[in-house]
Amino acid sequence: MKANLDQRIPYAVFENEIQLPILDITHPLFKASIDEQAYHLSCLKSARSIESLKKMPGFIRNIFVKMSNVDNSYLGGMRTLLYKLGPDLSRGIKLGFRDKWAVKQTSFMGLRIRLRDLCRIQSKILLAQLKDFPERNLCFYNIAGGPAPDSINTLILIQESDPELLKGRKIEINILDIDTYGPNFAKRCIDVLKQPGERFHGLDITLNMIHYDWSGPEALLQMSLERSGWIQLCSSEGGLFEYGSDSDIIENLNHFYTNSPADARVTGSLIFDRAHVNPGYLGFTEFIGVQIRYLGLEGLQRILTQTSWVLEEFHEIDTIYILFSLKKA
């Protein structure tokens, strides 16, 4: 077991020559960072914890809010990536006190479970398509994707399942985001993973960064048209469906629908509605000021009535996250 935990970790350079691990959900240290029973118990206890926190003196509550690292009412892509790495993979990175504290918290384990489970859903969808259509290229559109660990790790899972499926075809990861730090790091990760001896060596993988505001989704129309013969997957983990308005979600879905192929898929994550979400999670996000949407499955279904997409499958994580895939009606 110790030998497995010591498996080599590839690194990519972030800003200011800082080296960060490339997140690989198949690495033993990532797997060891998930204890689903401990996470479940943490979710059960969180409601009582937040009530106790509310009773604390104001200056202590302010310290706690600052420690949560929320900027502009959301958790940024690179900080989210840090918490997805977990305490073991992030060991050795020079962190401030707040990040050292946060990365060890059981509550952030949910981000790792969410990433892992979404990658499993996406790889299952794509494995079937890649087997059926060996001549077609593969294209990801990752809305608010930041460092795109879900797209990269979906490819890792496909390669581990059947490495021949990725050979001989063009593969694109298109990150559509207003952020530049996350996509830049994702590009450096792909560059490292394509080097000799690394996972993606010999594969034709391109990562494109597209400045994208989801309130103006016109870019999806042209991009999907230019790749009309490709296998296409549009995803948004912790992005559009957790922060976007109804109209933003509808417009993005409809724009992607117009020129994408008949077997295109949409995947993503959303939060349970207020009536059913874990009360501790609800209390915590409101306490620290995260402007998240409690869309819920019924909310998603309501939105889908204004599109030509239908729910294909969904997966729940501890009355907090719902992962889903959509197909064309």
Residue ranges and their predicted role:
Residues 133-149:
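Conserved class I S-adenosyl-L-methionine
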Residues 147-167:
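Conserved SAM-binding loop of SAM-dependent methyltransferases across substrates and taxa
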Residues 119, 155-159, 253-258:
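A structural alpha-helix within SAM-dependent methyltransferase catalytic domains
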Residues 1-133:
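Rossmann-like AdoMet
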Residues 107-122, 147-151, 178-186, 214, ...:
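Phosphate/oxyanion-binding active-site loops and adjacent basic polyanion-contact surfaces
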Residues 170-178:
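Conserved SAM-binding motif I beta-strand of class I
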Residues 39-72, 178-184, 188-329:
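Alpha-helical subdomain
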